[in-house]
Amino acid sequence: MARPKIALIGAGQIGGTLAHLAAIKELGDVVLFDIAEGTPQGKALDIAQSGPSEGFDAVMKGANSYEEIAGADVCIVTAGVPRKPGMSRDDLIGINLKVMKSVGEGIKAHAPNAFVICITNPLDAMVWALQQFSGLPAEKVVGMAGVLDSARFRHFLSVEFNVSMRDVTAFVLGGHGDTMVPLVRYSTVAGIPLPDLVQMGWTTQEKLDQIVQRTRDGGAEIVGLLKTGSAFYAPATSAIEMAEAYLKDQKRLLPCAAYVDGAFGLNGMYVGVPTIIGAGGIEKIVDIKLNDDEQAMFDKSVNAVKGLVEACKGIDSSLA
């Protein structure tokens, strides 16, 4: 039985990290694609040469032609321009929309049956555009957002409570940007909701509010520290978690930027919501109930995403 084929579109920091993680976890053979000649080939060769020490047999290949991604089971898209200090994710829309058009056409022509995970920012608008350009079924095109944002939230909570990250669950919904909605009420430590932990004296509401805001600013904090790029380790591990759920039919409940039509009162748009990922792609949207405050924050985030989608339509008339 042939191993699954994983195509990584973009051989930058995230793409290279994705390739390494996919190999270590033996998720399948990897094609690392980039328009820059030599870059994907060099990284693929470097990672392949770590195989004897790390004990994996996955085949690594670098490519500059979309023909090399033919028949891919999973495509993870990182291609585009990363943020720099002072930039918001939304500042990237014009440049990266053109990239999504090229990528979408490449996937449509050579890997139309793939499960596609988009990482390129501004995430919610780019995954929508990628689905439009590729023509793939909406349940097979998803954005990596909530898994990363929730991981950041979980990390900050584990540090605050001095407990293992394995015992912290957290949900972040909405757009992957400044209006994201970390759901305190649905987040727990070993099953104990965060509001109860405040009442128990484990932390204060003020500290919890600070953690929520730091989660929203999580990407910008790293951009400010690196100065020359954006995060890549955590985004890559988040996307690999999603890819593994699909390839192994794990039925994982993961927050992702998915196409929502009916749930949460939304009609046909991409935004971060709880999903079930299995062999069918996005197999279910988990329509959790929000209180008035949560709904107001979610609505604000949805409106921000709608604004980005309208901006995309203004830039490329084929999307209108």
UniProtKB/Swiss-Prot annotation:
GO biological process: lactate metabolic process; tricarboxylic acid cycle
Binding annotation for NAD(+): G10, A11, G12, Q13, I14, G15, D34, N96, I119, T120, N121
Active site (UniProt): H176 (proton acceptor)
Keywords, alphabetical: NAD, Oxidoreductase, Tricarboxylic acid cycle
The family this protein is said to belong to: Belongs to the LDH/MDH superfamily. MDH type 3 family.
Protein EC: 1.1.1.37
Designated name of the protein: Malate dehydrogenase
Protein residues bound to substrate: R83, R89, N121, R152
InterPro entries: L-lactate/malate_DH, Lactate/malate_DH_C, Lactate/malate_DH_N, Lactate_DH/Glyco_Ohase_4_C, Malate_DH_type3, NAD(P)-bd_dom_sf
GO molecular function: L-lactate dehydrogenase activity; L-malate dehydrogenase (NAD+) activity
Catalytic activity line of the entry: (S)-malate + NAD(+) = oxaloacetate + NADH + H(+)
Disulfide partners: none
The gene coding this protein: mdh
Top-level taxon of origin: Bacteria
Gene3D superfamilies, alphabetized: Lactate dehydrogenase/glycoside hydrolase, family 4, C-terminal, NAD(P)-binding Rossmann-like Domain
Function: Catalyzes the reversible oxidation of malate to oxaloacetate.
